[in-house]
Amino acid sequence: MKCPFCGHLEDRVIDSRAGGAGEVIRRRRECASCERRFTTYERVEDILPTVVKKDGRRESFDRQKLVRGLRIACNKRPVSTDQIEAIADAIEREAQESERREILSTELGERVMNHLRTLDEVAYVRFASVYRSFRDIDQFMVELGKLVKAKAP
């Protein structure tokens, strides 16, 4: 590890500890040249697929963009920040576990809607109206009809 003080490449690890609920390892190091101490952190690299947009563009998976969309859909609804974070965690985990290099934005949108459908129907309809780009009230009513039909015993 390169010393942040003198740039020397050799050091020794003095102490290692797990941190952040076991997701991070904190290491105290001492430079072999200047003998100053510094701290480094190690974590598993998240390998998330690239998102392929409807127009063919490719973007890195952006968890914050996902959370923003969920917050907008859930605005003024009885949905907690923890519930929004749990949905984002689940979708991110599903994307990681798919082990695919690319994922379609439409697939992510469908996953969001599946989670919102069970959490809050109003948030679901809000998200669907933007995601599916309803052009008129008839398309909106068709989606509401599907929701009502799925809810009926």
Swiss-Prot record:
Keywords: ATP-binding, DNA-binding, Metal-binding, Nucleotide-binding, Repressor, Transcription, Transcription regulation, Zinc, Zinc-finger
Origin superkingdom: Bacteria
PROSITE patterns: ATP_CONE (PS51161)
GO molecular function, one term: zinc ion binding
Cofactor: Zn(2+)
Keyword Zinc: yes
Biological processes annotated in GO: negative regulation of DNA-templated transcription
InterPro entries associated with the record: ATP-cone_dom, NrdR-like_N, RNR_NrdR-like
ZnF (unnamed) intervals: 3-34
Domain ATP-cone: 49-139
Family note: Belongs to the NrdR family.
Classification via NCBIfam families: transcriptional regulator NrdR (TIGR00244)
Role this protein plays: Negatively regulates transcription of bacterial ribonucleotide reductase nrd genes and operons by binding to NrdR-boxes.
Name the record gives this protein: Transcriptional repressor NrdR
Species: Sorangium cellulosum (strain So ce56) (Polyangium cellulosum (strain So ce56))
High-level lineage: Bacteria, Pseudomonadati, Myxococcota, Polyangia, Polyangiales
Gene designation per UniProt: nrdR
